């Protein structure tokens, strides 16, 4: 079946909130923040 993931992140410089991102199978989420040195990958396979 299809697996869904929710990713919430705060980008300090932009004060931007990324929320409720739904990804389908075979997709992945890549988030990077140079300021925070944060890298997150969410495989949905």
Curated annotation (Swiss-Prot):
Signal peptide boundaries: none
The keyword Lyase appears for this protein: no
Main location: secreted
GO MF terms, alphabetically ordered: alpha-L-arabinofuranosidase activity; xylan 1,4-beta-xylosidase activity
Family: Belongs to the glycoside hydrolase 3 family.
Catalytic activity: Hydrolysis of (1->4)-beta-D-xylans, to remove successive D-xylose residues from the non-reducing termini; Hydrolysis of terminal non-reducing alpha-L-arabinofuranoside residues in alpha-L-arabinosides
Function: A bifunctional beta-xylosidase/alpha-L-arabinosidase, exo-enzyme that acts synergistically with endohydrolases. Releases xylose and arabinose from cell walls.
Gene: Xyl1
Keyword annotations: Carbohydrate metabolism, Extracellular matrix, Glycosidase, Hydrolase, Multifunctional enzyme, Polysaccharide degradation, Secreted, Xylan degradation
Tissue: Strongly expressed in young roots, significantly reduced expression in older roots. Highest expression levels seen in root tips, some expression seen in root nodules and in the flowers, but not seen in other aerial parts of the plant such as in the stems, hypocotyls or leaves.
E.C. numbers: 3.2.1.37, 3.2.1.55
Species whose genome carries this gene: Medicago sativa (Alfalfa)
UniProt GO BP: xylan catabolic process
Name by which UniProt lists this protein: Beta-xylosidase/alpha-L-arabinofuranosidase 1
Top-level taxon of the source organism: Eukaryota
GO cellular component: extracellular region
Subcellular localization: Secreted, Extracellular space, Extracellular matrix
């Amino acid at each position: 079946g299809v697996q869904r993931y929710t990713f919430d992140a705060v980008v300090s410089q932009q004060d931007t909130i990324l929320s409720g991102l739904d990804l389908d199978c075979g997709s992945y989420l890549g988030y990077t923040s140079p300021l925070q040195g944060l890298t997150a990958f969410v495989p949905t396979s």
